[in-house]
Amino acid sequence: MAYVAVLAAVALWPQPVDRPVAGLLRAALRWLHGRGIPGWVDYGFVESAANVLLFVPLGALVAVVIGRGYWWVGAAAGLLISCAIELAQLLFLPGRYPTIADVLANTLGAVLGALLTLLVRRRRRAAP
């Protein structure tokens, strides 16, 4: 239940949730780049990675609840919920910026979570 509350807060906050820490994140990235982190690890990369990670638990939770053989429902749930969030941002949150890239990253996260559930189940079955 706490996960759902966090997901809703992050997705439906009136302004981008990273806005208060954007300057700090940019400074941290500059510092990391000065120490050898590749240039492609930029603000956009961090934002996309956060979108992926945010939906991993969703895919896993749905796959666990639905049961064996239907792991893909976790992935589908991620796609549908992400589309609903982006539509809500478009229609009701003028301070937010809905994008297809967010839908793709969120869906990837849900797929990874669902596949992780599948992998754990298979390992448990194979264990003596």
Annotate each PLM feature.
Residues 95-105:
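Non-cytosolic membrane-interface motifs at loop->transmembrane helix junctions
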